[in-house]
């Protein structure tokens, strides 16, 4: 039951990141914000999660994690209920930032730290991704109907209800006690900042810059291809359904092929997806591009996260994963939003292409070195 609780809570912690396309699309439809404003709203929330994760380096080995989960869930519920009341750009920016900083960001950091202490981490990551993809598909289908009356209330109430379900899952969560002295914790922090651990996290940042550059604006890319929001939602749901196969395949394959081959194949697939987004002009071509993006995103991620987990079995390194992911997901929409001219959202796919090339340049040599000289494996 503890594994199931971890998987469910990880879905809640990553929910806003995963449903960004329809969440930002809903904000655009309801409030009429432009691409740059949407990028900074996304960046503010993800930046809050990044800060929460960085602060977790201090409190993860020191504080009562069970109580912190409860506080984070309360903030997440309240933040989503308050969101429809924030009707201006600035107020919405502040509400979403605080919700991430004290709510979902804290929750996600704790859960990934807990996964770092458990066995079969690649399979846990893959299972968590499968559930996250299911949540994406649900929101893709429901969001157009939930905002049909010109309000964000339906979307945020659903998000709040899901966050509240975390209190039930928390009852089955087993957290290993790992209190550490200030000296030991500081020493661990110093070790994290140098060598392969830092390189792996930098690669994760570049990977998520690429993903988020497209993902934040993928609904808008559908609109540019001539699709209505309903049609885009159906294509995104279908594409997400294709994408879940990547996580299933990663869970089935495990370490049979190591990490280098699956990750290399994933980067090549993601580059092809970027090119397809640039040329998408029909529902089918758009859906196929979304499917490839999700397929190789979900296939690559368990191996990338698993390589990071090799370096630390206490969970302290793992709490930095949300910071790296949040940084990437915050930077991606901001950079893409600044380069988008008018309604030409295809620029976001070009930004993603460059980011994936940078990710490959960082991660592939690291994985090759780990293959030749296994690090942290037992």
Say what each PLM segment does:
Residues 91-106, 205, 285-299:
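Hydrophobic core of transmembrane alpha-helices in multi-pass small-molecule transporters
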Residues 20-21, 196-237:
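Extracytoplasmic gate region of multi-pass secondary transporters
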Residues 97-131:
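Cytoplasmic helix-loop-helix junction between adjacent transmembrane helices
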Residues 311-345, 352:
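A late C-terminal transmembrane helix in Major Facilitator Superfamily
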């Amino acid at each position: 039951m503890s594994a199931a609780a971890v998987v469910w809570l990880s879905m809640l912690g990553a929910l806003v990141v995963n449903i960004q396309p329809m969440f930002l699309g809903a904000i655009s439809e309801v409030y009429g914000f432009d691409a740059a404003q949407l990028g900074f709203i996304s960046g503010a929330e993800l930046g809050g999660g990044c800060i929460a994760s960085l602060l977790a380096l201090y409190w993860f080995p020191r504080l009562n994690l069970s109580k912190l989960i409860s506080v984070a869930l309360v903030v997440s519920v309240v933040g989503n209920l308050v969101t429809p009341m924030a009707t201006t750009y600035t107020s919405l920016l502040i509400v979403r930032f605080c919700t991430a900083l004290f709510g979902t960001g804290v929750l996600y950091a704790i859960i990934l730290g807990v996964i770092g202490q458990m066995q079969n981490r690649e399979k846990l990551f893959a299972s968590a991704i499968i559930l996250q993809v299911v949540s994406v598909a649900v929101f893709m289908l429901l969001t157009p109907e939930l905002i049909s009356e010109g309000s964000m209330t339906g979307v945020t109430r659903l998000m709040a209800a899901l966050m509240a379900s975390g209190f039930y899952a928390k009852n089955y969560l087993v957290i290993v006690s790992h209190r550490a002295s200030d000296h030991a914790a500081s020493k661990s922090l110093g070790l994290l900042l140098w060598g392969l651990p830092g390189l792996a996290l930098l690669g994760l940042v570049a990977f998520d810059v690429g993903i988020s550059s497209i993902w934040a604006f993928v609904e808008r890319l559908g609109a540019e291809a001539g699709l209505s929001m309903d049609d885009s939602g159906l294509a995104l749901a279908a594409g997400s359904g294709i994408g879940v196969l990547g996580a299933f395949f990663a869970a089935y394959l495990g370490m049979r092929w190591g990490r280098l081959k699956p990750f290399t194949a994933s980067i090549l697939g993601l580059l092809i997806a970027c090119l397809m987004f640039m040329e998408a002009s029909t529902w089918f071509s758009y859906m196929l591009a979304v499917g490839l993006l999700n397929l190789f995103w979900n296939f690559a991620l368990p191996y990338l996260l698993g390589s990071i987990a090799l370096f630390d079995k206490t969970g302290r390194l793992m709490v930095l994963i949300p910071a790296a992911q949040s940084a990437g997901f915050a930077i991606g929409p901001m950079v893409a939003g600044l380069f988008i001219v008018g309604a030409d959202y295809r620029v976001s796919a070009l930004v993603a292409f460059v980011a994936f090339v940078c990710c490959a340049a960082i991660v592939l040599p690291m994985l090759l070195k780990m293959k030749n000289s296994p690090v942290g494996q037992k």
